[in-house]
């Protein structure tokens, strides 16, 4: 996992820092959540499975903390041997984080994909927080029903209802993680928000637009190669 690079000294002696994995099945809003927390377009958004091909690191920094979010692909029910290897690799990476955010869609019933991830999370010893997304589409009793359904399946360290699209209750996500992270200096410069090169971010954004526009017309295994970039 990232090799745990050299720390950068911080003036705040109680500064907190650490790595947080974000997992969940496709179309629950993982990438939308990360983009909203970071305040920039980094992670590709699509309802097709496995559109996030690489583990994307996104960095949130303020005067009190640095949270390194990892949008982790591969935690899904495998269909072949390669898929099994990807799941094992993804779970191993989760074990090296300080916390895990398990993002679910509150407006959908807990399904086989969610249950598979829950079973994998039982192999992880760090705190796992249930993030119930899309609360803007729910009534209070529907939200409560969704929370109870997931709490029956796993002993979460906490539950955070949010709307990533409307940026509702995102501060609670940050506050909960700040309480969870250990004290320590930051890993990345404060102006860094991702480890992804700009060219790769642009190619992913183009790929996202193609997937959204064409949907069933083309497979999700498309590649975009950026030949030239110009600043305007």
Residue ranges and their predicted role:
Residues 198-232:
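P-loop NTP-binding site
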Residues 127, 136-194, 198:
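Canonical P-loop GTPase G-domain recognition
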Residues 49-51, 73-76, 106-110, 135-138, ...:
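Conserved nucleotide-binding/hydrolysis micro-motifs of P-loop NTPases
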Residues 40, 59-63, 78, 93-100, ...:
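Conserved, well-folded catalytic cores of nucleic-acid-processing
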Residues 24-25, 71, 132, 226-230:
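Flexible glycine-/small-residue-rich
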Residues 61-64, 88-159, 231-232:
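Conserved C-terminal guanine-recognition region of P-loop GTPase G domains, centered on the G4
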Residues 6-88, 92-96:
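Conserved G1/Walker A P-loop phosphate-binding module
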């Amino acid at each position: 996992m990232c090799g745990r690079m050299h720390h950068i000294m911080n003036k705040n002696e109680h500064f907190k820092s650490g790595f947080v994995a974000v997992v969940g099945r496709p179309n629950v809003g993982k990438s939308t959540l990360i983009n909203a927390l970071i305040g920039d377009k980094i992670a590709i958004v699509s309802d097709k499975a496995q559109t996030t091909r690489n583990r994307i690191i996104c960095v949130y920094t303020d005067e009190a903390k640095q949270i390194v979010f990892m949008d982790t692909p591969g935690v899904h029910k495998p269909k072949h041997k390669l898929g099994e290897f990807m799941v094992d690799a993804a779970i191993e990476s989760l074990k090296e984080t300080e916390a895990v955010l398990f993002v679910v869609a509150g407006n959908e019933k807990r399904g086989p994909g969610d249950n598979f991830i829950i079973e994998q999370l039982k192999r992880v010893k760090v705190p796992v927080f249930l993030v119930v997304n899309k609360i803007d589409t729910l009534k209070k009793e529907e939200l409560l029903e969704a929370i109870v359904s997931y709490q029956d399946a796993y002993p979460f360290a906490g539950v955070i209802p949010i709307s990533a699209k409307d940026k509702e209750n995102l501060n609670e996500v940050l506050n909960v993680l700040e309480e969870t992270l250990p004290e320590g200096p930051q890993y990345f410069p404060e102006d860094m928000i991702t480890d992804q090169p700009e060219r790769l971010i642009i190619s992913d954004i183009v790929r996202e637009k193609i997937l959204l526009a064409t949907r069933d017309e083309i497979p999700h295994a498309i590649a975009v190669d950026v030949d030239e970039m110009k600043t305007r």
